[in-house]
Amino acid sequence: MQTVIKNGTVYQNGRLIHADVLIEDQKIKAIGTDLTGDKVIDATGKLVSPGLVDVHVHYRDPGQTYKEDIETGSKAAAHGGFTTVGAMPNVTPVPDTPDLMKKMVQENKQKGIVHIFQYGPITKNETTDELPDYAALKKAGAFALSNDGHGVQTAQTMYLAMQEAKKNDLIVAAHAQDDSLFNHGIVNEGEKAKELNLPPVTELAETTQIARDLLLAEKTGVHYHICHVSTKTSVELVRIAKACGINVTCEAAPHHLLLTEDDIPKDNGYYKMNPPLRSKEDQVALLVGLLDGTIDLIATDHAPHAKQEKQGGMQNAAFGITGSETAFSTLYTKFVKEDKVFTLEQLLSWLSDQPAKVFGLKKAGVLEPGCPADVAIFDLEHETELKEKNYQSKGINTPFTGQKIYGATVMTMVDGEVVYQRGEK
């Protein structure tokens, strides 16, 4: 059967064009005008995009499925227009052996409704200095390495990890955090920490480890990717490193682009995340970094928690914010429609073809004949409200609930099959 998406504004090759998209046998067959098919999806007035790509999600499965599981996490991704995600390995047990990795990959495929690529850990159990067998993990299905949630604390361990990752052509995606400097902090070091009387987090906890790792990456030649950069100095370090030819890429999270520490209204656990919300100066630096190419992509760091884990104030709340279901719409509304900081084409690139390119996910994040029919359709014209009852994730831990947005997802397709349709829970 042939399905045609008619009369949409299609994002293809960095441009927006008025076109139809023809789908057959799970693939894009053609993009053009006056195309016909057995089934017609009317996209008049809608944006037709490649399925978005999020290289940073936490599905808590196995081990903490009361927070999220593969099924609900992938449904949340589809609700946000994402058709490809990278799942972090901070689950229980950590997939640090070939058997555990194979099982994880199999579970992702069986339970997920989007394409789920699985990270392996940089170190065994994510908390030791012992390296797993990277070659075996890659053969079992790992597409990259990360200890996200934990910084690799010793330079020697990271140096050895980068050497082995380079040998096996694996990306090292680092959560840059020096625990001795983080020192059980909660909010960014500044006036807000003083106002709330909460332990501060110095930016040095992030920047010193980035500086260390950039030197190690230069020495080893590994592809070093930095998760959720959040400070002006971090951006400057990456900018200098790229100018020096170091093989480094990095991502920014939607919440660090949209919010600052000044937006924390009170001691509210929904605003507790790691890295913490930073200063206005840091926020501006992130936006400039995206626009000048220092920051390569946007990734959500979707980190769901049970409702009770985010209540009772920031001191005892868990770190983390959801993002899969709110990323595109909140970013589009704020930075494209309202403030005109960047274009729709730029936003779509940072959320689709760029993450796919950086991580070597061939045929993801693009609409081209012969590629998988992974498609997202968005409504840019009508205002809607973000409501808890509409979330597909088990986690409702986002401060964006109640916000009026444009860019709601109308439909998401994976391999030509509809996996999300607005109005259907």
Swiss-Prot record:
Gene Ontology biological-process entries: 'de novo' UMP biosynthetic process; purine nucleobase catabolic process
Catalyzed reaction equations: (S)-dihydroorotate + H2O = N-carbamoyl-L-aspartate + H(+)
Pathway entry: Pyrimidine metabolism; UMP biosynthesis via de novo pathway; (S)-dihydroorotate from bicarbonate: step 3/3
Binding site for Zn(2+) 1: H56, H58, D148, D301
Active-site residue numbers: D301
CDD domains: DHOase_IIa
Keyword set, alphabetical order: Hydrolase, Metal-binding, Pyrimidine biosynthesis, Zinc
Binding annotation for Zn(2+) 2: D148, H175, H228
Residues where substrate binds: H58, Y59, R60, N90, N274, H305, F319, G320
Cross-referenced Pfam families: Amidohydro_1
HAMAP family from the UniProt entry: PyrC_classI_B (MF_00220_B)
Entries under PANTHER family matching the protein: ALLANTOINASE
Protein purpose: Catalyzes the reversible cyclization of carbamoyl aspartate to dihydroorotate.
Family: Belongs to the metallo-dependent hydrolases superfamily. DHOase family. Class I DHOase subfamily.
Annotated protein name in UniProt: Dihydroorotase
Species per Swiss-Prot/TrEMBL record: Lactobacillus delbrueckii subsp. bulgaricus (strain ATCC BAA-365 / Lb-18)
Gene: pyrC
